[in-house]
Amino acid sequence: LAGMEAAKESGTKDLGKLVSELCGAPKDSVARRGCLLVEEALGNPAFEDLDWIVLTQKAREHGDAGVRAEAARCLGLLDPQLALPVVRQMASKDSSSRVRRAALLAALTLAPPTEEEDCSWALERFGAEESPEVRKALAVALGRHDLALIEKVAKALAVACEDSDWKVAACAAVSLGLTRCDLAPVTLSRLLQTSADWRLRGAAVVGLTKALHPDGLPPIIAALADSEPLVARTAHGYLSSLRPADAPGPDPEVWSQWWQETGSKRPLRDAKAQRERNRKYGYSTSHETIFRGMDVLVLESRGDHIQTVLERLAINHRLTSGAKVPESGLDAGGVFVSNCTGEMEPADIERLDWFVHVGGYLFGSCWALTETIQRLAPGIVGKLPTTGEVMNRVLASPCHKNSPYLEGVFGAGVQPIYSLVGSHLIEVQQPERVEVLVDSVQCAQDHGDGNLACWFQLGHGTIMDSANHFDVQGLTEATHLDKAEDRMAYAMDHMGASFALIRETAKEKFWGSNHRAAQEVFDDSVLRLLSNFVRLRR
């Protein structure tokens, strides 16, 4: 931002010089800022004559893979005619799988595989790539039904269902279903019936649910009897969505009879129903409606207690604990919330790893960053090193005002305060993969960095982390509020309480103490963040 301001005064040439110098800086954190400066300048008519390809060359040739990956991501924002050849070369030639992954996704952004030439390039990379992490990203990217060469894509994904890396195979199985080709139910039914690996059987069920093909329903019904609770619950969750008003339990015979008598006569996709879903899950929808019918599994732990928030809002959920996730079962179409401290056993993490890769959503708070998220996805985000325990209350700000995930989180004139209770602050280790949604200048000044909430994709699924606790927002931890008027002002300024609410409750006795007021006036800003992810998914 300082570079932008300086360039406005001194001219275009100075900005180009600054970008080039930053991109060539030996220190990786400095070099990445050159790419960030390009992103800030894009769209500004004053800088449209600058050759960003040339100016970022030093970043693309940098010795640090993270800088090169950031350069690749930056190229994905430029003119496709200029940037596509460069980024494709990086995707095939760079020695680092991290860089190749970033370049691949940038190339697919610039030229989606909806044209034959672009799809052929993606398929060539899918066959030639050695890194499982990059193959996994490709498998996910090919999970679309609007691609050119769709039959070739389906065949490539069918082959990848037998990949030696289970994560690649699982992602390919889900993507094969998303192609909606006739090959999908045949291949996935066979995988479900023959695989000894519960992870692949579960992925086959998810793929069949995405295929929207009547031939896929009998295998899904048969999966209700699978020995792995995760596979059976995922199958039952999908079947229940087909008859939400009167869904029976997970009895294969009952569901088979329903399918033969009634279910097979109904369409598995309905444009009118989808339009109704779009209306139903609009921004202004209540939390309870957004989560209705969705499996929400919450890890009980020693720190945070989101279940108290869910109970208050009448959101149905289940509880589990460390070492019990396998028997609890996970629905791949659902949500898992890891309360701080997020401590779990290896078998729990193994199930969650599968859950996210095939499309599940995982939300964590505070220590769950270290105890859950880092164990699932090491090296992407981690705990920021601090000199001591983080105990603070900081003003939070949105990083991207136009992000759909932040709708309703920051009301006009409202600045939430995040309560950090022994918090594990977020250190972003792979910036090209992570979007920071909420940060704090005050937190950065006090503790060295200010990332408070972020998200990233893992396989077909999503992980979101918040540095604070879900259940101690609002008046619970507020300080220096001596009078009822102080608490009302706090509720309006930091919790988004409306004038109407304040007028309606101004004479209530609960305003006399923080504890009582917190029971009546709720700060749902963090839950709104979670709800936005679920709403947009549905």
Please identify what each model-predicted range represents.
Residues 1, 28-32, 65-66, 96-98, ...:
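Alpha-helix N-cap/helix-start positions at coil->helix boundaries
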Residues 3, 34-35, 71, 103, ...:
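Conserved hydrophobic register position within alpha-solenoid helical repeats
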Residues 6-9, 37-41, 74-77, 106-109, ...:
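Core register positions within helices of long alpha-helical scaffolds
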Residues 12-24, 45-59, 80-92, 112-127, ...:
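Amphipathic alpha-helical scaffolding segments comprising HEAT/armadillo-like alpha-solenoid repeats
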Residues 233, 237, 248-295, 299-300, ...:
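Hydrophobic targeting/anchoring helices
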Residues 272-294, 446-450, 458-538:
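Extracellular ligand-binding/catalytic regions of CAZymes and related secreted enzymes
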Residues 294-376:
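Helical hinge/lid and interdomain linker segments adjacent to catalytic or ligand-binding clefts
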Residues 343-418:
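A glycine-rich, often tryptophan-bearing local segment used as a flexible ligand/cofactor-contacting loop or short
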